[in-house]
Design a protein with these regions (language model features):
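Central regulatory/effector-binding core of bacterial HTH transcription factors
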Residues: 1-60, 128
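Short, well-ordered beta-strand segments
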Residues: 1-3, 51, 75, 99, ...
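A late-sequence structural motif
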Residues: 12, 162-200
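Hydrophobic hinge/microswitch elements
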Residues: 35-48, 53-54, 104-163
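Short secondary-structure boundary segments
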Residues: 55-56, 78, 149-151, 176, ...
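Flexible hinge/capping segments at coil-to-helix
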Residues: 59-98
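Short beta-strand->loop
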Residues: 63-73, 149, 158-172
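Secondary-structure junction motif
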Residues: 82-83, 88, 97-118, 186-195, ...
């Protein structure tokens, strides 16, 4: 039983699951998609055995296996008058136009931390329940947003007039990790699963 957060599930699982079924037909994986907050709570209460999420995030006492690093990109309308450079500095982000996922999603916190501008927390609009929704809002010129590189690589911008550029910040990355309860007797299974996830 594994929880996966929504800013990872649609971009990593389609590549990973077919290969896992082929190579490990004996492994029965029951998946559920939850926000980071709910997924960690499910792990703590024994509703799931492991969680695929993005760090940093408060997880309590857990063991973890590193999967990958994932950069953050700034997404904006193609005809944005500011014509953002190849690497977008946080100072160029208009916090009044910044659209983020609502509370409970760790990507919101990662985006705010990467910008290192405390005033953004009050000004940014926490509205989206999915990255696809945020992209559609940007495509309709309602603001700009932050996207993980894995979403951009998976084609989330296809069919839109939205472009994405890397955020120029030392904190503009998140760690994709598999976590499980400390002292779990299934540690070897989780490490094997992490190895399969790293192979992507």
């Amino acid at each position: 039983r594994m929880s996966v957060i929504p800013t990872i599930a649609p971009f990593l699982l389609p590549r990973f699951l077919p290969r896992l079924r082929r190579e490990r037909p004996d492994l029965e994986l029951l998946l559920r998609e939850e926000t980071s907050h709910d997924a960690v709570e499910s792990l703590q209460h024994g509703r799931v055995d492991c969680v695929l999420l993005a760090l940093p995030f408060t997880t309590g006492e857990v063991e973890k296996a590193h999967i990958a690093h994932d950069e953050l990109y700034v997404a904006f309308p193609k005809d944005d008058p500011r014509d953002p450079p190849e690497f977008v500095p946080p100072s160029m982000i208009d916090e009044g136009r910044l659209l983020l996922l609502e509370d409970g999603h760790c990507l919101k916190d990662h985006a705010l931390a990467a910008c290192n501008r405390p005033e953004m927390r009050a000004s940014a609009t926490m509205i989206g329940t999915s990255l696809h929704t945020l992209v559609q809002m940007v495509d309709n010129d309602l603001g700009l947003t932050m996207l993980p590189k894995m979403a951009v690589d998976a084609g989330i911008l296809n069919g839109t007039d939205v472009v994405a550029r890397p955020l120029k910040s030392k904190n503009a990355t998140r760690e994709i990790a598999l976590i499980w309860r400390k002292n779990s007797p299934r540690r070897a299974d989780f490490e094997l699963l992490a190895e399969e996830l790293r192979a992507g």
